[in-house]
Amino acid sequence: MIIVAPPQQAGTAGKAGSQFTGEVHPYLTLPSTDGVVINTVCFTPGGHTFWHRHEHGQILQVLAGRGLVQAEGGPIRVIRAGDTIWAPPGERHWHGAAPDSYLTHTAISLGVTAWEEEVADGDYLATTVDGEV
């Protein structure tokens, strides 16, 4: 059993690298253990991931704010605090904050994450299935 206490000092979040558009702050909640990585990620308005996929899938639990998620070939969906999202193994997808809202979620990634290209601005700003942007 492993117990990890949250960071106790300001500035312990990592600055997102080349897998994100906009300002994104990932907090490593649990280092990689048996192929499972758990992060809490804070996205500023408009911040979002690049296209990516997970070897054994990914679970997102939205803690605060409003965001967007899209699987390749599917509609953009609005996500809100309390929502849980399951991306099946190998499904190409992206997720992040709405253009006008912050978003915080916990991401539970199973297996290797394969990062791909940036989401085109026109795709990110497309109308969602709910009629929102």
Locations of the language-model features?
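A short hydrophobic beta-strand segment most commonly corresponding to one strand
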Residues: 59, 86, 100-119
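Short, conserved beta-strand element in jelly-roll/cupin
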Residues: 42-44, 53-70, 108-111
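A short, N-terminal "cap"/entry segment at the start of jelly-roll beta-barrel domains
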Residues: 1-36, 115-133
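Asparagine-centered strand-capping/turn motif at beta-strand->loop junctions
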Residues: 96-98
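Short acidic-glycine-tyrosine-enriched beta hairpin
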Residues: 73-90
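Conserved short histidine dyad/triad with adjacent acidic residue
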Residues: 23, 39-54, 89
